[in-house]
Amino acid sequence: MKNIEIEGKKISFEVKSKDVRYVYLKLKPDFSLQVTVPRNRDVDINKILEKKRPWLEKKVREISQKIKIFDKNTVLYRGERFEIKTYYVKNPEKRIRLYKKVAFVYEDSNKKKEEILMEFLERETMKYVKERVEEFKNELNVTYASISTKNMKKWGYCTKDGKISFNWRLICLPERIADYIIFHELLHLRHFNHSKQFRSEMEKYFVDSKEIKKTLKRYYS
């Protein structure tokens, strides 16, 4: 891989030839750059990267402000970052314990750290969602068909027949943002769109809606 320095960061990039008409650039969260060029066509990559430098600088700044939900060493829980410490224990009584910003994970031959964390977060998300849904549905006077958690890119989704799904990582977010997402999906039971009336009701309950949406875009897994 070749490298280019943008905003003080070393960006590694690879070039792929595909059946496309134009050159495409994609900067990933790990600051690796994918350059796609038309097949069988001579392209001056360095010239293109210099031309796109202002765009790349903007993207690097945006990614630098993003908040990673969890990685090998840390995990977010209710908006707080916990250091992960893993121990191998035969037949552990508890799989995970949170104490003073540390997540103690007890794995064995049957379950590893990643699976334990995922199950814990999914369980905590469902518990939190159920509590908040019961409160918000009475506030909105709506009924739903079912509530579930899924592994998906969106934070939440509501179908026309009242089935609501939430991202199992929801519990990682600050409570104010998680509540916004839950309320947002429940409100779709009253307005199945993002009409002016829908937005007006959201802002009635969440006067900081614009700031919440802006902050939410910073979180990624």
Residue ranges: model-predicted function:
Residues M1-D179, L189-S221:
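Active-site-proximal or metal-binding-adjacent scaffold patches in catalytic folds
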Residues I182:
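Walker B beta-strand of ABC/ABC-like P-loop ATPase nucleotide-binding domains
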Residues E185:
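Walker B catalytic acidic pair
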